[in-house]
């Protein structure tokens, strides 16, 4: 987490007040980061570049604070990518199966029909997010991130080089970036 906390014995947080406080600190810092990013955008549009830069700098600070609390909640470090994909899918599932339907029902009950509709529509987006994370996790488990059974068009996300083959190149022949920069080329135009 930080040098300050490294010497602390890792204790079981589950169910403690400290766990609750870490979750509150993580949520608070995360929300502050987003708000300050929005505030920076407004300041920039209104012609206040210095104020925008200060909001952006502070947002970056809040991001690091949130990361520190999140790491503490995760036992000292952020988990591996597969675990992160599973955590993300579970979070998205909770949002579209429980949180947004409940919020939509409550908003409708209180007469906020437009907000109820927005809660419902965002819930559908979260359902798509869950599906995407689950598909990505399956690709990772099955070794299909950079290899497929049939020829594909792969594109380097750094320089745009395209390659046709069953696997992405180990290294881009144009910019020398590693295979990790390749993805399947998608055409949406």
Functional labels for PLM-detected ranges:
Residues 3-4:
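Intrinsic-disorder-associated, low-complexity terminal segments enriched in Asp/Asn/His/Tyr and depleted
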Residues 7-189:
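Non-heme di-metal
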């Amino acid at each position: 987490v930080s040098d300050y906390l490294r010497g602390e014995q890792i204790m079981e947080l589950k169910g403690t007040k400290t766990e609750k406080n870490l979750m509150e600190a993580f949520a608070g810092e995360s929300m502050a980061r987003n708000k300050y990013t929005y505030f920076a955008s407004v300041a920039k549009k209104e012609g206040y570049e210095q104020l925008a830069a200060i909001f952006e700098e502070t947002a970056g600070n809040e991001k690091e604070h949130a990361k520190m609390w999140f790491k503490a909640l995760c036992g000292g470090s952020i988990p591996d990518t597969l675990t992160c994909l599973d955590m993300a899918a579970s979070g998205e599932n909770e949002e579209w199966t429980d949180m947004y339907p409940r919020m939509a029902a409550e908003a409708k009950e209180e007469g906020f029909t437009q907000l109820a509709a927005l809660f419902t529509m965002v819930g559908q987006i979260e359902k798509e997010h869950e599906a995407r994370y689950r598909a990505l996790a399956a690709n990772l488990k099955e070794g299909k991130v950079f290899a497929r059974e049939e020829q594909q068009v792969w594109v380097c996300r750094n320089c745009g080089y395209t390659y046709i083959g069953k696997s992405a190149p180990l290294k881009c022949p144009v910019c020398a970036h590693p295979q990790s920069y390749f993805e399947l080329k998608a055409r949406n135009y």
